[in-house]
Amino acid sequence: MEPLKTHTGTIAVLDRVNVDTDQIIPKQFLKRVERTGFGQFLFFDWRFLPNGEDNPDFELNQPHAKQGTILVAGHNFGCGSSREHAPWAIKDYGFRVVIAPSFADIFYNNCFKNGILPVKLKQEEVTALMEKGKDTAYSLTVNLEAQTVTSEDGFEATFEIDGYWKEMLINGWDEIGLTLRYEEQIKQFEASRV
């Protein structure tokens, strides 16, 4: 995985609550086993009209949101089934950070495992960000090392994160990568057991 220490990007506002994994990546697109290629199907039923054209009313289809790399959403984001395809689609679409007041537990952990930083902020902070980025391009800097979210206009917030996941993201490790750091010790242990 690519290390994530600090990320600066434009926000894309999805002012909806209880966005479930079926809405993030609909079931008909779950036939792939590799982690790439899912971004084109992100929020498919909302992003596109039945004829396949972009839905002009969908938040992420607005010109200022199309280049967003930080998704700002409502509470309980990622609820529903535990499919890992949901964070795969979010990352493949181009988001590195998701900010919300709360996340479904499995989705929250799957984000870390796939190199996405899920940031829990207070509801009033998320509401303020949504107002700032609803109709215009709005840039944020998320500093994982300092655990802060800031902008040039003075917005500041802090967030909590488990030390394990923080270290994993900062170093760009997934769980296999973490294990491989101890490859020599594992080999020595295995050799001693023969």
Curated annotation (Swiss-Prot):
HAMAP family: LeuD_type1 (MF_01031)
UniProt key word Protein biosynthesis: no
Assembly with partners or alone: Heterodimer of LeuC and LeuD.
Family (UniProt): Belongs to the LeuD family. LeuD type 1 subfamily.
EC class (word): lyase
Any single biological process term in GO: L-leucine biosynthetic process
Enzyme Commission number(s): 4.2.1.33
Protein name: 3-isopropylmalate dehydratase small subunit
Catalyzed reactions per annotation: (2R,3S)-3-isopropylmalate = (2S)-2-isopropylmalate
Gene3D superfamilies in the record: Aconitase, domain 4
InterPro entries: 3-IsopropMal_deHydase_ssu, Aconitase/3IPM_dehydase_swvl, AconitaseA/IPMdHydase_ssu_swvl, IPMI_Swivel, LeuD
GO cellular component: 3-isopropylmalate dehydratase complex
Function: Catalyzes the isomerization between 2-isopropylmalate and 3-isopropylmalate, via the formation of 2-isopropylmaleate.
Record keyword Lyase present: yes
